């Protein structure tokens, strides 16, 4: 059992760091897709002339 004075497990620290990065990237993707700047985005398929 770990106490507060013992060093944290390195694998847990790496896992938490990777999880935080993935959550940040997911949040940024959702914000850029549905946030206030999304109105300026265009669909390249709609802009393409057949």
From Swiss-Prot:
It comes from the Bacteria. The keyword Transmembrane helix applies. Keywords: Membrane, Thylakoid, Transmembrane, Transmembrane helix. GO terms for cellular component: plasma membrane-derived thylakoid membrane. The keyword Membrane applies. The chain crosses the membrane at residues 14-34. It is a single-pass membrane protein. It holds the Pfam family PsbN. May play a role in photosystem I and II biogenesis. Belongs to the PsbN family. This is Protein PsbN. The gene is psbN.
């Amino acid at each position: 059992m770990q106490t507060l004075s013992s060093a944290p497990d390195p694998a847990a620290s790496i896992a938490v760091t990777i999880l935080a990065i993935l959550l940040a990237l997911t949040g940024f993707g959702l914000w850029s897709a549905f946030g206030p700047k999304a109105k300026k985005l265009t669909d390249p398929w709609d802009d393409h002339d057949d």
